[in-house]
Amino acid sequence: RVATIDTLAPDDCYDLVFVTLQAGQLPDVLPILKQNRSEYFVFVGNDPHAVEVMQAMQRPADKIAFGFQSSGGHRDVDKVVSAHVGVGMTIGGATAPLSGVFRYRVKTAFEGAKYKLTFVSDMDGWLKCHLALILPACYLCYACSGDLSKATKEQRDMVLDAAWEACEMLKAAHIPVDDKENTDCYRAGTPGRRKMDAMVLTLCKTPLGRLCVSDHAMHAVAEMQYLDEAFEGLRARTSVRMTAWDALRSQMPSWDIMRKKTAKARR
């Protein structure tokens, strides 16, 4: 079991500080993190504002990293159910590769663990591209009241069509997009798209969809709304038409209704 802390005094010092919060919670703790004397920080999770976070920390760019762990699951009363295929993390600087010293510290932290580290040079772009798929999947979850088995073929297709549109929008907004890992996987008629079609079908027709997608979407409505609003802010900088995106998004209840449903379920 990994030891964690829920307080961080200015004089506390760690070799590495991993910050794991839902998107939207970070602004409240950034002042505390900024005052701490530790040198190296890794912000883990969905973050549409990596560059802004890096700047707010007021440290050299090579002292701040962003990471994303590909896993899913849910918490029961007495246990945590986890879903993952080869646990690991994609990690890197917001807009530049990590320094050799930083990479060494991260590798040392996971030494001896069966944990794959994938280093990239532009995590701000990577995270935004990640949202290009995550948000349409989220809209589908809400449209189906969390039961992905109810999704129609048309809706499944719209998820990937919307992801392709989102990648095109990001490029128009001058966000770096790795076409091989993103756009080419969502473009209709390509081998990559056929693989993604199979993946989406599997998620919708097996328990993997609940573990990997809908559990998180249904229990993190505030986070998903925060990510949605951030993505809409990016979109406002472009004139790219996103018909599949808009059609799928229009099928979900309003964010206000989703928040009320979440609050009612917690009572």
Q: Residue ranges of each PLM-predicted region?
A:
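Rossmann-like NAD(P)(H) cofactor-binding subdomain of soluble oxidoreductases
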Residues: 1-80
